[in-house]
Amino acid sequence: MSLSLGIDTGGTFTDAVLFDPGRGVVAAAKRLTTKHDLALGIGAAIDAVLEQHPAEIAFVGLSTTLATNAVVEGQGNPACLILIGYPEAALDRAGLREAIGGDPVVAVAGGHRPSGEEQAPLDLDAVRAAVLRHAPAVTAFAVAGYFAVRNPAHEQAVRDLVDDLTGKPVTCGHELTSGLDAPRRALTALLNARLIPLTASLIRAVRGRLDARGIKAPLMVVKGDGSLIADRFALARPVETVLSGPAASVVGARWLTGREDCFVSDIGGTTTDIAILKDGRPLVNREGAQVGGWRTMVEAVEIRTFGLGGDSEVRIEPGIGLAVGPRRSVPLSLLAHQHPEMLAALRRQADRAEGISLDGRFALRLRALDTDTLSPPERRIWDALADGPQPLETVLSSHLLDRPLERLVARGLVILSGFTPTDAAHVLGLHGGWSRDAALLGAALWARRPAEPGWTPPVDAEAFARSVLERLTADSALALVEAALARDGVADPAREARGLLPRRAVAGDPAASDLLRPTLALGLPLVGIGASAATYYPEIARRLGTESVVPEHAGVTNAIGAVASGVLQRAIVTITAPEEGRFRVHAPAGIRTFGSLEEAAAHAEAEARGRAEALAREAGGQEVAVTVTRADRVVSMAGGLDLFVESTVTATAAGRPRMG
């Protein structure tokens, strides 16, 4: 019998399942993700399930948190953003200027008006000069034109020129969204461009391992809304896989538990992702996914992502105290397991009469990408790590190397190692398999650190480990409170969730106050998934006064979700009225003007229907069915007259994934 193969590649683990809709999970395996060569971890997971149950594979589904993690951690390849006709003030909206960071941004004349008419001629000479200037230092380009969703001509012209001059990937804003919000559209295009090399590396790794095993089945990737797209589609639009892993986890959790209404909280190595199921369906955010503080324009399952996981960096927040995340760190227990010589380095640090701030911290290469563009200080650090991990005190022989190291980390070339909640679980015997000795040494080094404002050193290593897990548990509970408040429409849910009363309600020490002991209660059960869900979520649910559900196969829920979904694509066409008696249709193919609304609507419906069906088939769907809706915006005027403002025609195409 043919089975489906589900794969989930996360920041720490790569999971694989063999799945049959009638029987459920036939075989499952979990292996470490190998960032330096993704194919190794993927191949190991695939081999493990096929050894358990050799089978013919008809379909392969892939979910991944790599894109999500890259956005949360501020990583990604350098990309050049070309803004066409944008006002200078647009850079200060939607966090666009902050998101650009050190990447080149070019503003050129051009763009359109809301009517779709040109506001200024496109300055292709300026584009040509900028592209030739910046191409050697970037891996991709992003193009965003003012009101390009009403007329994409300028974006298309720049895209074609960049392709002719460089051959490098180009992302256009109008290809990703039809929504009106120029800064957020530019932000989404930029994130997409940065993620293209990472996604290409992942898909090549999966396809290579499938080919090596003679598996010729179609490969599809989970989108952020939980639906599936063909691998070639994901290569061009990787930003749509932001929240791929979390979306797959929601689909998988629904399948595993049968729960219709619940919170779904997925704890991974890097992030905790929280979603809500209502009436058996995940809530979808039509306004766009929010990841790592950025509000994109990618339609996705309504998920709140927090930099909080088993491998989150443990640190001191000045004036506040012990903090966990948002950056991922390689657990010391894993580092010493993979590099036993690091255990000796930890012992040397512990044997010193006095500790230093860099004790228990290491750096190692993560992956080799575009290293030809490294600055001399960055190259010095990169070369120092050629033979394996090194203590930070060795790597940072000069304070002048602090910023170059941070840049290498931000680009995803280098990763730091230090104490994490996973290490704390090793110390306390809640987790095993890696080096407990390294975890104990790391905790002991932390326990002897001098006091800082907001933090008093614990009495010993075990006390420190308990404080780390308490911080993770309390922060996870507050993250769920924030998700609930956000869904209830609270204006600033992050601030409200971390007020005095919520913090005291989820605290592990009930004796914090003898006079006031507030309690909180979630209105839905809590489904906890992820490799460490059983360790944390029963206690988190208890503190939040709700039922805890940790299903069988909770550790491979994402891989299950990768093969339990379908194909879904939408196309939106807008109709405006630039003047009385004229109705303009704004479609991806261009604009057309009609003399009546019904003529315009008929054309818009045909455009939307054809576009949605084509996208669904391109995304790998079969047996595609299309539904079309139309929403008119009409304003009532004095005297009983109605004024047409605009109309939105939405076509939704749904189908089953194509089987091999």
Regions from the PLM with identified roles:
Residues 1-660:
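N-terminally biased helix-coil "hinge/interface" segments that flank
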